[in-house]
Structure formats: C-alpha cells, structure tokens
Amino acid sequence: MAAPAVRASPLAAFQALAKRCLEHGHPQLCEQALIEAEALQRQASARSAYPCQTLLLGVQADLVMQQLQAGRGALAISDLQAATRGCSGL
C-alpha cells in the first residue's frame, strides 16, 4: 500500500512562493504569489478573520512594490513572516 502524499498547506506554499518573489523579484513568481495572496485574503474575509486579511493585504502591497522594483527588502520579509504567523489557522 502506498503512503499518502504529503502536501504543503496553501499558506505554507504561498509563503515559500512570496519569499522567493521578495528575495529575487522574478515577475512570474510575483504574479503567482499575488494570485495566491488574493485567494487567501478572500478566504480570510469569508471566515471573518480580519486581522489575517489585513496582514495579507499588506503582503500583497509588498509583492506589487517588488514587481515595480521598489521592494522593501527585509521589511517585506518581516511582513510576510507576520502574515504567516497571523494566518496560521487559514
């Protein structure tokens, strides 16, 4: 019998993708991270998890700034870490 496949949670997958975007600025990575952030923040809204939603909106702003070559470096990574902690139940 085969072992069940282990999949990362949507939040963990988003965190990894967003971190790569913020560190390297590849347009395709950032675009996909924005799409995933939007889905997560809508999910947070639907669950009335407004603090989490607010944190995700901040990360979305950081991702857009990165796309515009105006990234905030370590501050953006810190925002991403805060969102990951604040949205842990998502």
PLM regions with names:
Residues 1-5:
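C-terminal segment of classical bacterial N-terminal signal peptides
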Residues 6-90:
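Post-signal/leader-peptide non-cytosolic segments of secretory proteins
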